[in-house]
């Protein structure tokens, strides 16, 4: 644990005075290796094989099942890209732990371990991503069985209009559950359970009713208080889910909806080199940029370039990833624990995950690096 007044922390805070987008050239594989090492370090802090996150004042937090789950595919993809098979071990260890803590109803708990929370739809869907990745890697049926049980529970918890409320975070319907739909469709593709595809399609129909003419989505924030100006993290979840579902269903209206929202953010980013952390219904921004949302948008812009062929999406993805590599580079002067990590906000004292290095921000930075490598000329 460190104080924000110690020498290393002061040096890190000084680095965060630089404008976002002040690019320093960093080799992609160097950035990727450092980011992956942070996730492995996060796992090594606890006996349970889950991943927590580092906070500049409070130190390491407890393991987070949801984010551990969707970090697994990132570790396995990095192992392949870096030709570093040792990364397979922490991915499989994490999956084995998640098997042990699956709830009797089939879900996984919300929040961090030790908080005693019930199964939550969104969190459970992200663990399914990890289960499916390890099943594909090992052919161990236990992981597919767990994924199917979880997916069936999610489908059973759905409301008639296609949204999820009672078994979801805050008990309210949210459009970023498109990021739930895709894991359901992936399980369906393997098992053939028709009700999983039906549940995903019902939710997608509901989500499309929440989009305004200018591309902005209502009911998109992970709070009630600020639902009129959602964070880029949940906006990007929504977009990414739409694109992933289109890949699985081949429904052009999903790409159109994703592209409409994405172009609004891209048009703000390309001339300015930065984004705000929140956007209201007129796409007017507020708060410091969220590194998680920025990384996720780099991923979705990469995907949209591949789907549409529109060059600005490629330009935005590359430019954003270069800026994120520079933010990561600043971690070299800070405490050893956070080396290679992506902060919650830039600067570190932004409102979202203040002074913290959430493992999910680093997970999406890894995914962004890999996505951009696929679209470079």
Where are these regions (language model features)?
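Glycan-recognition and catalytic cores of secretory/periplasmic carbohydrate-active enzymes
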Residues: 1-377
């Amino acid at each position: 644990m460190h104080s924000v007044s110690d020498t290393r922390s002061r040096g890190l805070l000084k680095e965060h005075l630089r404008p976002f987008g002040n690019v320093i050239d960093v080799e992609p594989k160097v950035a990727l290796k450092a980011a992956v090492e942070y996730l492995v370090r996060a796992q090594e802090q606890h006996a349970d094989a889950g991943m927590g996150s580092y906070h500049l004042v409070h130190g390491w937090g407890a393991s987070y099942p949801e984010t551990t789950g969707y970090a697994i595919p990132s570790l396995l993809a990095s192992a392949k890209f870096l030709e570093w098979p040792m990364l397979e071990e922490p991915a499989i260890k994490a999956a084995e732990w998640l098997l042990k803590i699956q709830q009797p109803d089939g879900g996984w708990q919300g929040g961090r371990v030790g908080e005693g929370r019930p199964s939550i739809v969104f969190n459970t869907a992200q663990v399914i991503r990890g289960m499916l990745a390890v099943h594909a890697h090992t052919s161990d049926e236990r992981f597919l069985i767990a994924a199917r049980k979880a997916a069936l529970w999610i489908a059973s918890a759905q409301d008639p209009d296609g949204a999820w409320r009672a078994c979801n975070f805050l008990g309210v319907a949210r459009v970023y559950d498109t990021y739930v739909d895709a894991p359901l469709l992936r399980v369906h593709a393997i098992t053939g359970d028709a009700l999983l595809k039906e549940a995903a399609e019902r939710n997608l129909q509901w989500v499309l009713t929440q989009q305004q003419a200018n591309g902005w989505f209502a009911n998109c924030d992970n709070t009630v208080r600020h639902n009129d100006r959602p964070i880029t993290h949940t906006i990007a979840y929504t977009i990414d889910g739409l694109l992933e579902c289109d890949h699985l269903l081949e429904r052009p209206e999903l790409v159109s909806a994703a592209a409409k929202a994405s172009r609004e953010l891209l048009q703000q980013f390309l001339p300015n080199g930065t984004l705000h952390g929140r956007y209201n219904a007129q796409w007017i921004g507020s708060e410091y940029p969220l590194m998680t949302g920025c990384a996720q948008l780099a991923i979705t812009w990469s995907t949209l370039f591949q789907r549409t062929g529109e060059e600005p999406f490629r330009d935005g993805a590359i430019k954003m990833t270069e800026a994120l590599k520079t933010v990561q580079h600043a971690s070299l002067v800070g405490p050893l624990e956070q080396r290679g990590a992506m902060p919650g906000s830039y600067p570190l004292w932004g409102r979202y995950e203040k002074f913290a290095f959430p493992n999910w921000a680093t997970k999406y930075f890894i995914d962004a690096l890999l996505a951009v490598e696929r679209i470079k000329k």
